[in-house]
């Protein structure tokens, strides 16, 4: 049976005028295959509001799968995240000026949640299609990790049938005009997220293949 | 009262002939100040044995503080780790040929442990002394994270008065002769670990200052 | 009057199965605007033959402008080259096994030639179109620099009305599946070279704006 | 017969409070072996004055060998430069506010000068001593390249018996506290320059071994 996939992207932050996560997510809104139908929603780069908005979107769309997407400026690959940690520690203020320091996201939640998405399969599938990808083991401690942890905490408490996860993506080329940083084109990112969504719809379980990072 | 600090380093792995973590740790063996006295032990880069060796060293030395140190080839800063995750996922075999894939380190342990060391203070102190340092939020999924998680699991179950943590360090220059990678001199690393040990001995609690990473 | 632009790309080298310079160049073959008409030719990654092939292509097409293009794996921007040096010093053998060491390309040629293309204008124009670009001051010492120097030496001796230059481009994404390296999509590279060709056709002279590198 | 080696370093620029080239050079002042005796002089990071100061130092010390040294922030190796180009193109103003754009350094000089130092030998010797090193083929277009070109132009016209060259060095650790950049310790840099000076004193000619860069 076809799975409903909710994909979210953030609004721009950290002096950027565009956020490739939302640019890519919105292009996938309404995309359908036999396995998956995608809906996209935008999330504010703001602690607390980010999670409120996500919960409302889940309430509204009743998805089988939730994939939150965020910009990881400086990375050169599409990086599905494996683990979310119970820590908000903001190096810069969010879009409303909040800057939590060493705060727990959920006071009675576990130290970390594992993604429920088949991140090794998704990564392998992207690479088969010529897209640079790697599993990541840290989503940072800013709003991206906050949303990822909050998503996993929410669905584990209220709707354990939903599978959730997070994907970090590089800058798009136009963002790197005045900095020296790697980028991937929006087309490549959109293709990567489409592959991720369909793979997540097709497979509940991940493949057991060597992976990991040395540090 | 003066604190006993156990510092561990690994033997060489991944085709290296030297491991800067052990080179640095052994130079600190016997170092004393008013606040701290350091003992060093070597740990094999082998899943399971690493932790057995560490437990024996803790049994033998009865330290107040344990700081495990490991090589993070490619990093350019001294990076105290904040979180250990319950996952062994080896990209390459360890020094005895074991290559666990997606295994839990402790089947009934939590998803993650936080360090008990004041990593922001340690980082700030290193920077005051002109040493590049940053808190890291991922220790990878190889033997370093395995030892870090295993240490925290062990002391939380058997000896919660011990405070433990992990520091990743860059290559030393001689390791980068035939690769293009950053390095720090052994002298700098030794100084950094000494500062870390003394700071950990002086302060139980960390300082609450902005930090974190965007991703 | 419309300018004839010859764009060349290389065949794959250094264990790659594709060379983005030729993939991009061949897509531009036959492209026309009011200012420029583009012809593409492939060049072997072989000392000597590379230059023979280029001279024949110039003879055949009688271009106004020649833009040679080569892969610079590891760069993250489109980088028009400013200077070619009279040195062949091969770190690896070329595609026919030649590995010249510290050889002059032209025994009675100057130590270096400046490009005749308006590289600052080209770079600025690419950036206006959202493409990461920067002027480069070294084309290396392998076949790319060899062809660039040989081109400039040839036209300065035989056909000074022709304006010539070289552009280095990054890997395309599919080349970075099994390495950690930045890339730009083929579409982005094709657009960049089209902008470069048209800009070179429109402007004989470069703009005088701040640029350069600190080292 | 023992060679007199003049080593120069620059004063700080680009918002830095220290320049590792001068910190290292001044530590070598007076250093003697059977082959070499080193004198150090400081050079201002200012177009024109840099060269005036260098010429006076040459006049005063009557060296056999001149090695100018400069900071290349972001590099991770000691990089003897092979070629100086006849171009001043400043991305930022120098320490007196001059910012030449696309200017020739010497209107009737050649497009480039080759170093007269045995840069491959020097690099190999540093690596034998465990120091990361590589020959570089671009000294940039700022005051470093200006001084290097000016040095070679001066001695080729007035004192061709003097052999000259340039070495770029990384940041030292203290400069990278608030940026993410590689560094080498001052001790390592001092050792590297000492090896460079002695090697240059011992060998007039370079070794013919594979080297070079692909781009």
UniProtKB/Swiss-Prot annotation, chains A, B, C, D:
Chief localisation class: cytoplasm
Presence of the UniProt keyword Hydrolase in the record: yes
EC assignment: 3.4.19.3
Keyword Ribosomal protein set for record: no
Keywords, in A-Z order: Cytoplasm, Hydrolase, Protease, Thiol protease
Location within or outside the cell: Cytoplasm
Active site: 81, 144, 168
CC terms in the record's Gene Ontology section: cytosol
Any one biological process term the GO annotation gives: proteolysis
Stored InterPro entries: Peptidase_C15, Peptidase_C15-like, Peptidase_C15-like_sf, PGP-I_bact-type, PGPEP1_Cys_AS, PGPEP1_Glu_AS
GO molecular function: pyroglutamyl-peptidase activity
Entries under CDD domains matching the protein: Peptidase_C15 (cd00501)
Taxonomic superkingdom: Bacteria
Signal peptide as annotated in the record: none
Pfam families from the UniProt entry: Peptidase_C15
Reactions accelerated catalytically: Release of an N-terminal pyroglutamyl group from a polypeptide, the second amino acid generally not being Pro
Subunit structure: Homotetramer.
Known function: Removes 5-oxoproline from various penultimate amino acid residues except L-proline.
Family: Belongs to the peptidase C15 family.
Protein name in UniProt: Pyrrolidone-carboxylate peptidase
Biological source species: Bacillus subtilis (strain 168)
Gene this protein is translated from: pcp
